[in-house]
Regions:
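Short, flexible, mixed-charge glycine/proline-rich loop motifs
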Residues: 16-20, 30-33
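Membrane-interface extramembranous regions at the lipid-water interface
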Residues: 24, 34, 40-121, 138-171, ...
């Protein structure tokens, strides 16, 4: 006998919501959301909540992954970047003084001038390559770290999140929007990492605002420095761009210091969130 339309609707609605129950992980005992197939803490496979589970659509699921090691590596890279930028600023100052000396005829002979210029180019070139390698590696790892900590918030079942892990990273590469969207995403990550269950009421530290301020300022000055360096050909032009390059390196140091503080704090928040009972998060 065929079931009535009303009965069919009741069966379907039960599959979608009514029959799904929260469950404890058989391995670590943490309470998990009904839709989870693996434990958000230990990653163990979860038993089906009901026979209707297999009929339900499978949503995208994320597993909490401890960011401690990633955070540690990123902090070391930021420290390396701070050191490299500081050394580069000193080298840039030495080059600036060399150019002024060349302009003012401060060398006794052309041989002395050529020797000083070659030593400067070698030193500055090696330091520049080191800075570039550290910067590229830091950018890649920073993007991976942002994706990881954002993904963890979704794995914890944090309610009301506006940014996906992909867009928490992606907004950095969207012109114009990258002036504020990445900061909004980082604010969300900061607040939600501090209190996943009720993050909307959490405040942020001034450190986060200062990080973004110096990030924007250093990015603008670095862009100006690059454009001026590419156009500079005459000796006077090379001398003029020197102070801008030095300022750019100093601002990069300041920006990296605040970035380090932000990364360290969010990493600490997520470590505490992982150690707490996730049953309270989903309550």
């Amino acid at each position: 006998m065929l079931a009535s339309p009303g009965a069919l609707w009741q069966d379907c609605s039960g599959v979608q919501s009514g029959e799904l129950q929260a469950m404890n992980c058989p391995q670590c005992g943490v309470l998990n959301e009904p839709a989870n197939v693996t434990c958000v803490r230990c990653g163990a496979a979860l038993p089906a909540a009901s026979s209707a589970r297999g009929a339900a659509a499978m949503p995208v699921r994320r597993v909490f992954r401890d960011p401690k090691r990633l955070t540690k590596w990123l902090i070391w890279l930021l420290v390396a970047g701070i050191v490299c930028d500081a050394v580069f600023a000193i080298s840039e100052l030495a080059q600036h003084q060399l150019l002024i000396r060349m302009r003012d005829g401060g060398f006794a002979s052309e041989l002395e001038l050529m020797s000083a210029a070659e030593a400067n180019d070698l030193r500055h070139g090696i330091i520049g390559i080191a800075v570039m390698l550290v910067v590229i590696t830091t950018i890649v790892l920073f993007a991976v770290w942002i994706h990881r900590v954002s993904s963890n918030l979704h794995a914890l079942g944090t309610p009301g999140l506006r940014f996906t892990p992909g867009w928490a990273v992606g907004w950095y590469f969207v012109p114009i929007a990258n002036l504020w969207k990445p900061f909004q995403a980082m604010k969300e990550i900061w607040r939600a990492s501090k209190n996943p269950g009720a993050w909307q009421s959490e405040t942020i530290s001034p450190v986060l605002g200062w990080w973004w301020f110096w990030w924007i300022v250093s990015s603008i000055v670095s862009n100006v420095s690059l454009r001026m360096s590419l156009r500079a050909e005459a000796l006077d032009e090379l001398i003029s761009v020197g102070p801008v390059n030095i300022a750019s390196s100093v601002l990069d140091v300041i920006s990296a210091i605040f970035a380090l503080l932000v990364v360290k704090k969010i990493g600490s928040f997520q470590a505490m969130a992982a150690d707490r009972s996730l049953g309270a998060v989903f309550a």
